[in-house]
A protein has these predicted regions:
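Structured binding elements
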Residues: 119
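Short acidic-glycine-tyrosine-enriched beta hairpin
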Residues: 132-150
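Conserved short histidine dyad/triad with adjacent acidic residue
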Residues: 97-113
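Double-stranded beta-helix
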Residues: 12, 154-188
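A short, N-terminal "cap"/entry segment at the start of jelly-roll beta-barrel domains
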Residues: 12-94, 180, 186-188
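Extreme N-terminal basic, low-complexity initiation segments
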Residues: 2-9
């Protein structure tokens, strides 16, 4: 039986994370006294509602079987400031994605060694920064980002961008801020 304040299996979910506040010895119970739990379900539901609102406003129909990836570079808590939603529609010798930026959101500076990508602004507003030059994209505008080119983007009111590129490889995003590169839990 659990001891007082001990977390149990009922406290665990893929939408929860535990963090120790003190050292926990072998066979010691994980309790509210030596750790804390963060529940992410409500935040993830809020993000999903925000994304659905933008998709509805843009009148875009997505395939029913598509999975939404939440890219949260500095953690879910800072997602509304730094992050992006990614829907991968095709990833073969070529790749097609829809990238959704929420209002006020920044996608931090990065570059790719293997892939070249082109962005088409389909909805909203987007400022793309390429090698320290700001480009305020217009609806329907296409910008190509060559291999090795540092790029970041932001949106004031929210945006949907179609990305067409070479094959997406999970080891081909190199962020200028090393804290992001060291974060193994930046995708949900």
């Amino acid at each position: 039986p659990p001891i007082k304040n001990q977390f149990t299996a009922n406290d665990c979910s893929k939408y929860s994370s535990f963090e120790a506040t003190t050292e926990i010895n072998k066979d010691e119970a994980i309790t509210k006294d030596n750790s804390f739990i963060t529940h992410h379900r409500l935040l993830l539901e809020k993000i999903t509602r925000q994304v659905n609102k933008i998709i509805k406003a843009a009148e875009i129909q997505l395939p029913s079987s598509i999975q939404m990836e939440i890219s949260h570079h500095y953690g879910l808590e800072k997602f509304n400031q730094f992050g992006m939603i990614i829907f991968t529609l095709i990833n073969r010798t070529y790749c097609k994605k829809l990238l959704i930026s929420l209002p006020g959101q920044v996608h931090p500076a990065q570059y790719h060694k293997k892939k070249e990508e082109s962005f088409l602004l389909m909805f909203g507003d987007l400022t793309l920064t390429l090698d320290n030059k700001n480009i305020k994209m217009k609806l329907g505008e296409v910008v190509t980002i060559e291999k090795g080119m540092v790029h970041q983007f932001s949106s004031k009111k929210g945006a949907i961008v179609e990305e067409i590129s070479d094959t997406h490889n999970t080891d081909d995003s190199f962020y200028i801020d090393d804290k992001i590169n060291l974060n193994d839990n930046r995708k949900t």
